[in-house]
């Protein structure tokens, strides 16, 4: 089921993203698909979507053409990042082109066609997300703020041979 205005806070946040021009229709549509897959809108989900889309641009790859090693571990809420990556990058557990490793950090390494990019969320961003109750009225508002930031505000990254 696609989120709509009837879906409460998530629907309202998605409508606000569209109205605010949160980075273009690819981002908006991918976030909508990620919410459908994951079950709700949250900031780590959006951060994962942003990582996957960034990796696709950096590696000039279509969904499913990359491999990803994600270092979140399997403990929510940080692991919600995985669902965003699966939807945006097409790296899925079913395809076997994604793996999850400790140590519980917001970092993913993507590789394709002999190239690699490692993307890590800024510590300040992760801290802000983890303390969202102190800063935002809702989880959806926190996700909306993440969707509007530039890659440079969210991530550090390193390119290299794959």
Located regions from the model:
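Non-transmembrane, aqueous-exposed alpha-helical and coiled segments at domain scale
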Residues: 2-162
């Amino acid at each position: 089921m696609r989120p709509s205005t009837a879906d409460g806070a998530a629907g309202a946040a998605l409508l606000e993203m569209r109205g605010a021009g949160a980075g273009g229709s690819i981002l908006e549509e991918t976030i909508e698909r990620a919410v459908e897959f994951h079950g709700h809108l949250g900031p780590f989900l959006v951060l994962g979507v942003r990582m996957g889309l960034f990796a696709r641009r950096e590696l000039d790859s279509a969904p499913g053409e990359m491999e990803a090693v994600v270092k979140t571990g399997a403990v929510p809420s940080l692991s919600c990042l995985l669902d965003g990556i699966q939807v945006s990058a097409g790296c899925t557990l079913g395809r076997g082109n994604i793996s999850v490793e400790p140590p519980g950090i917001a970092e993913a390494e993507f590789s394709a066609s002999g190239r690699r990019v490692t993307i890590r969320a800024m510590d300040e961003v992760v801290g802000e997300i983890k303390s969202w109750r102190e800063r935002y009225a809702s989880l959806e508002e926190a996700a909306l703020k993440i969707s509007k930031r530039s890659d440079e505000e969210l991530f550090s990254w390193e390119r290299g041979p794959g």
